[in-house]
């Protein structure tokens, strides 16, 4: 979960041995912490151990994940043709609503950005009603890259769990992404290569 990643310093899915605590005893793991360059002062140790006590470690259930993913893909097909739906991972996907937007939201007085937000809210509602899952939506009237950046950098932190980035937002939002690894496609290895080329920011 986003909170789990924030507390334990994880940017993505990891393994039990990557955690700064022992999953059996819930005690701080100095070995893992040092290996990952994490602090080992008493305040941090107490902080990690307090959170470790209330952290649930659950086994993966890939069959169930896949089944729910297929349910969500079928919901997408209510709003776009199969050719406009692009599964990305077990919990992410793209849907191009260009050709169906005016069909679902025909009001000519609304901007395409407003229509996209309204239709995305409808899709969120359908996903929640059918699966019980709260979904987060990144949108763009420009391209999939900006939609993905909107998802990762803004939508996850908004009350509606939606955000729309377009070309006019590049200077204010894209260039303002604080860490290069928060940009889709840039991992730590790529970041090091970019640093070697003298590139230290998205701008």
Identify the residue ranges that each predicted region occupies.
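Gly/Gly-Pro- and Ser/Thr-rich, intrinsically disordered tail segments characteristic of DNA damage-repair
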Residues: 1-203
